Amino acid sequence: MPVKIKIEKKEKHTRARLGKLTTPHGEVETPIFMPVGTQATVKTMTPEEVKETGGRLVLSNTYHLYLRPGHDLVKEAGGLHKFMNWDGPILTDSGGFQVFSLGPLRTITEEGVEFRSHIDGSKHFFTPEKVMEIEQALGADIAMAFDECAPYPCEKEYAVAALERTTRWAERCKRVHKREDQALFGIIQGGVFPDLRERSAKELLAMDFPGYGIGGLSVGEPKELMYEVLDQLMPIMPEDKPRYLMGVGSPDCLIEGVVRGVDMFDCVLPTRIARNGTVFTHNGKLTVRNAEYARDFRPMDQQCDCYACRNYSRAYIRHLIKTDEILGIRLTTIHNLHFIQHLMQNIRQAIREDRLLEYREDFLKVFNAG
């Protein structure tokens, strides 16, 4: 099996697990946060800079890379690792979420999804087989099965149909996925309905994927509902398979996910808000582009030792962002990724020492106060 997880420690008071995820491109510690490199790049960053922030496993996007530059071109370049000069592990999502986000631009049938490109309106058709062809050409260490992501809120009837189709599509993905140096993960759906989540999990667990994504959360539902789904789902998940909560990356959700037994996370949030001039700090979010920081010569976060906080002030970074200088959003991105990776490092240490609940309380008390 190209990808497997070895659980090294279970936290005494929670479901949290400390593990090592082995992939064809090296071993990474879990719980892990994956920076998102939608178009084969973590926006504004070089691979070396991503590594300096603590990033070890990155995510890239099947839908976007299929449209531009095309999966055949990436294959010709020697695969995604060579193309983007990243020597660590990569995960590609299946494009399911992106396609379903297109709303009126897409039509779902049993065979697959017809959609119009958000770039030029051209027509395309994704089937599970087509998505497997694309992901195998990209050659990431982990490929996600093609799923149907039900929106929130949605009728139970719709959630059932999406769940059933996700199961059938997972079977089709598994049938045609042949690449031996790539692991195919299944994705559990079911909306916010506990019985449907359980059903989806059981159907996918029966297919014995080497790992499982939990999809269809963080799509607008209240956080409490997401936590309820995890509380109910995690006890039935196999101990020896990685569990990946898709699209989740705010500091509070990362901690709450780990407490419930999640191993892997990804999210555009840290990099996206950085480009809007907002950063995470130990005292909550700070919008550094705001006028109140024009004469503030302190670092963005006084407790942070990232490159940006060691060298630049809020006033300077605000100036860069206000004048549309690219360095500004590079510095906020470096900081946010460093902040999240540092948080994950602290979480792993807290699991090691069986004090995750104390860490959660201490961190959130100060973070939420901001």
Swiss-Prot record:
Pfam families with a match to the protein in the record: TGT (PF01702)
Residues of the active site: 93 (proton acceptor), 266 (nucleophile)
Annotated EC: 2.4.2.29
Keyword set includes Glycosyltransferase: yes
Domain of life: Bacteria
A GO cellular component annotation in the UniProt record: cytosol
Function: Catalyzes the base-exchange of a guanine (G) residue with the queuine precursor 7-aminomethyl-7-deazaguanine (PreQ1) at position 34 (anticodon wobble position) in tRNAs with GU(N) anticodons (tRNA-Asp, -Asn, -His and -Tyr). Catalysis occurs through a double-displacement mechanism. The nucleophile active site attacks the C1' of nucleotide 34 to detach the guanine base from the RNA, forming a covalent enzyme-RNA intermediate. The proton acceptor active site deprotonates the incoming PreQ1, allowing a nucleophilic attack on the C1' of the ribose to form the product.
Reaction equations catalysed: 7-aminomethyl-7-carbaguanine + guanosine(34) in tRNA = 7-aminomethyl-7-carbaguanosine(34) in tRNA + guanine
Renumbered residue ranges of the record's region RNA binding: 247-253, 271-275
Pathway(s) where this gene product acts: tRNA modification; tRNA-queuosine biosynthesis
Organism encoding this protein: Desulforamulus reducens (strain ATCC BAA-1160 / DSM 100696 / MI-1) (Desulfotomaculum reducens)
Xref: InterPro entries: ArchSynthase1/Queuine_TRR, TGT, TGT-like_sf, tRNA_ribo_trans-like
Amino acids binding substrate: 93-97, 147, 189, 216
Family, as annotated: Belongs to the queuine tRNA-ribosyltransferase family.
Cofactor note: Binds 1 zinc ion per subunit.
Required cofactor(s): Zn(2+)
UniProt subunit comment: Homodimer. Within each dimer, one monomer is responsible for RNA recognition and catalysis, while the other monomer binds to the replacement base PreQ1.
Residues that bind Zn(2+): 304, 306, 309, 335
Protein name: Queuine tRNA-ribosyltransferase
PANTHER family associated with the record: QUEUINE TRNA-RIBOSYLTRANSFERASE (PTHR46499:SF1)
Gene Ontology terms for molecular function: metal ion binding; tRNA-guanosine(34) queuine transglycosylase activity
Keywords assigned by UniProt, alphabetized: Glycosyltransferase, Metal-binding, Queuosine biosynthesis, Transferase, tRNA processing, Zinc
Keyword Metal-binding recorded: yes
GO BP annotation list: queuosine biosynthetic process; tRNA wobble guanine modification; tRNA-guanine transglycosylation
